């Protein structure tokens, strides 16, 4: 089964598509596709407290592209997590609603602690040599 993970950060949005493989009794994640778009959401958020119209439109287009890529690779599970810039953006909820309406992707804004836990957990779940 293929899964997708979308990381929406301050500087870039990333889509990782992977597949869990079992080999010799060990499980590891086989990277199927990786896409990075340098959105730079933080530029407008840290200046004005909001994601400006241009960045918002780029963000929605990026999520549309990620949704299409996920369909192409027949992703069964997709999780989208947003971090610092979306936590700070006064219009973050409105943008998340627009993304959901246009793509069906629900963007989850996570805390700094949850972000650290996900990074830590992912590190120990992956066989780095195989990733």
Label for each model-derived stretch:
Residues 11-13:
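Conserved Rossmann-like nucleotide-cofactor binding loop
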Residues 1-8, 17-131:
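Nucleotide/phosphate-binding catalytic cleft detector across ATP-hydrolyzing
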């Amino acid at each position: 089964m293929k899964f997708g993970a979308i990381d929406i950060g301050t500087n870039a949005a990333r889509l990782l598509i992977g597949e869990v493989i079992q080999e010799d009794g060990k499980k590891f994640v086989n990277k199927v596709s990786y896409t990075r778009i340098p959105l730079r959401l933080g530029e407008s958020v840290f200046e004005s407290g909001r994601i400006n119209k241009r960045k918002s439109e780029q963000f929605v287009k990026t999520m549309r592209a990620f949704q299409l890529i996920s369909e192409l690779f027949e992703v069964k599970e997709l999780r989208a997590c947003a971090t610092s810039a979306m936590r700070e953006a006064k219009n973050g909820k409105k943008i998340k609603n627009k993304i959901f309406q246009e793509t069906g992707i629900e963007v989850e804004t996570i805390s700094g602690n949850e972000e650290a836990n996900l990074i830590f957990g992912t590190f120990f779940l992956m066989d780095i040599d195989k990733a």
